[in-house]
Amino acid sequence: MAKKVLLLSLYSAVLSTWFGFGYVQCKLPTSRSEIPNFDYTVAQQPDQSDACEQNEVCMVSVECILDAKKKAILKPCSTVPSVDGVCCPSSEYNGTSSRVQQNSEEHAADHLVLQAIHEGRREYDEKLRFEDEHRAVMTAKEKPEAMFHRMFLPGGLKTHGKEVVDAEEQANVYGHVFASRKYAELTNMTLKQRQGDRFARIPRAIRKRCLPPVPCNPHSRYRTIDGSCNNPLPDRTSWGMEGYPFDRVLEPAYEDGVWAPRIHSVTGNLLPSARVISVALFPDEYRPDPRLNILFMQMGQFISHDFTLSRGFTTKHGQAIECCTPNCTAPLFGPHRHFACFPIEVPPNDPFYSRFGVRCLNLVRIRLAQGPECQLGYAKQADLVTHFLDASTVYGSTNDVAAELRAFQQGRLKDSFPNGIELLPFARNRTACVPWARVCYEGGDIRTNQLLGLTMVHTLFMREHNRLAVGLSKINPHWDDERLYQEARRILIAEYQNVVYNEFLPILLGHERVQQLGLADPFDTYTNYYDPNLRPMTLAEVGAAAHRYGHSLVEGFFRFLTRESPPEDVFIKDIFNDPSKTLEPNSFDVMMFSFNQQPMEQMDRFLTYGLTRFLFKERKPFGSDLASLNIQRGRDFAVRPYNDYREWAGLGRITDFNQLGEVGALLAQVYESPDDVDLWPGGVLEPPAEGAVVGSTFVALLSAGYTRYKRADRYYFTNGPEVNPGAFTLQQLGEIRRTTLAGIICANADHKEDFYQAQEALRQSSADNVPVPCTRYDTVNLGLWREEGF
């Protein structure tokens, strides 16, 4: 039976962290040839004066970007809140801008920079002229119907099937990249210098190209929608906001040190085709997990969409780019190939695509971002959502989207009642769904309709917001719509963060690892996790590889259970971007109960054909291949080989495939050297670490990512009022900490008296996790939010 689907994330038209691609579907060939004042207590910061030297910073090990060998000789220390750490040299601290400071001391004459910028812009303008001349061939012919582009255009940026493009911003970003190449050539920079971002700063005369600071109110009780002003320091107000670039654990492997993707083996030959690797390493086999359910997989996708979204490059007119011939019989070459094309070649003997004459899978390189440093440098991919765990999937990452989702009554979000139960609001623009879908919804994220399970998790948190807003309005009838909306949002984000760090991560990374890193939260006590020097930026290695672990967890079907009928299996290949089944009676309760009971797939090398053959197939006999897209996207991002991250994580390098046993034999079938193995397949093939879902390399990378999401977030829900101007009272905090995902589900079930929910919502029901009536679950006591004196 076919296997998995999910955690789609980065796309090539949208990065996300689970599905990653920038894909325009091929035509079917016609023949086989074709802050408040209240009492509080705070976890005290330990005295570090005797532990670390003046030029060192005490931090959790994953925050220090040194590799494991260098970390091993660092002096131990105790961080806030009393977590074992290391004394990391401040120049190696990921949260500082040490590279920029060093670069500014090594900058060349301004005239060389100006010359490079001039020539870079001229080169970009020439490419645009070339694009105009060959637009008929370079652009997709099925827009706006082509699902693979349509679904990636963020809400509010669509106009008649085309994306609104800020031409000047795009010219600055790509002119900057071409200028960096020119500068590297003019100054004879080595590849190591380029990959280390040792470029010159931009002269003051033209620094209008640099990102300006965002004006902020450092005492705002509520976090902004777009993630700005989380860090109120003058030069850091844009840190972590939507559109900010990804960061990295290791330097990128751009072959020219600037933007050329990683395509060569260490032997000098070309790396194997991503599709060849997919076929050899990721077959379909039904292997259900014995403990965890589909809801764990689906929450993983929902969480990943909160901090990862990218889209592929488009023409200056906002049109999707085509990198394959119309019938996908070959990649485009020569004058017809757009400079942002990075298609996947399919061999003629492919066991599936050869039936349709497909020799090319379309993929366009991810759009780049203006970097925060006012300097030339290598390309940095744009993340189009906030870099925080702030439920942007519910509220959006821009003020325009947030406003569109609000009812502006009683603090509520918009909803709909097409079958008598509360569902998401109908989308004004149905291009996020297949044309034949009977309904299409709108949420805070453009991928809301991708999978039924994802749509229902969006529905769950929309319902929870509205439940909180209505409850607060009854307790505080004098509050206006804005206050009710912001307070309900503040509580929901806290509930969500509590679920992520205290229910989801202990399963994903292992309880021991979560405790060791200080990722688990205490009850009824404030913390001071916040580190203003740590940049809240999603790691490219997490978005482009590690958080795509979830593709292995996806089952090829959803099994819906009701008392009145036998189980119904709905195959994911038939319902991508089609949430029509939500219109059936009692759909919310039926689906949420079923997700609790159905096992997810095991974390292993087996992927459902629903993802590797039929991804977004619409009504065609074939779709795309998510495994191939993941591998190619990692190369687009210039993520370094798997071996480099093994070494960074302290596992040691592999020098012979035989060191990995059976897995090594599989890898040797497609790779020439252990140093060629791509990060995503290497990480997926690792056996799970003790107590974790994923292997040790992904545990290390995900730990680094989730440490940032907590320690670089001033508004993290357990931070006290000396840090967080929107801190909860201790009584409120304790109430939130006792909230569970099971309780949230029960609070929003339509028929609570008939709904049974196990306490551990991410695990299958069992003798140790028996479902009990929802009437036994307590909800958040909103009486603690009553404003006295009114």
UniProtKB/Swiss-Prot annotation:
Cystine crosslinks: C216-C229, C433-C440, C746-C774
Keywords: Acetylation, Cleavage on pair of basic residues, Disulfide bond, Glycoprotein, Heme, Hydrogen peroxide, Hydroxylation, Iron, Metal-binding, Oxidoreductase, Peroxidase, Secreted, Signal
Main location: secreted
EC code: 1.11.1.7
Modified positions (N-acetylcysteine) in chain numbering: C210
PTM entry text: N-glycosylated on Trp by mannose and on Asn by N-acetylglucosamine.
Pfam family name, one: An_peroxidase
pH dependence as annotated: Optimum pH is 8.0 with guaiacol as the reducing agent.
Record bears the keyword Chaperone: no
InterPro entries, sorted: Haem_peroxidase_animal (IPR019791), Haem_peroxidase_sf (IPR010255), Haem_peroxidase_sf_animal (IPR037120)
Site (Transition state stabilizer): R447
GO CC annotations, alphabetized: extracellular region
Cofactor comment: Binds 1 heme b (iron(II)-protoporphyrin IX) group per heterodimer.
Cofactor dependence: heme b
Propeptide residues according to the Swiss-Prot or TrEMBL record: 17-209
Acetylation in keyword set: yes
Annotated active site: H305
GO MF annotation list: heme binding; lactoperoxidase activity; metal ion binding; peroxidase activity
Signal peptide: 1-16
Similarity section: Belongs to the peroxidase family. XPO subfamily.
Subunit structure comment from the entry: Heterodimer.
Function: Involved in the formation of a rigid and insoluble egg chorion by catalyzing chorion protein cross-linking through dityrosine formation and phenol oxidase-catalyzed chorion melanization.
Protein's name in the database: Chorion peroxidase
Species, as recorded: Aedes aegypti
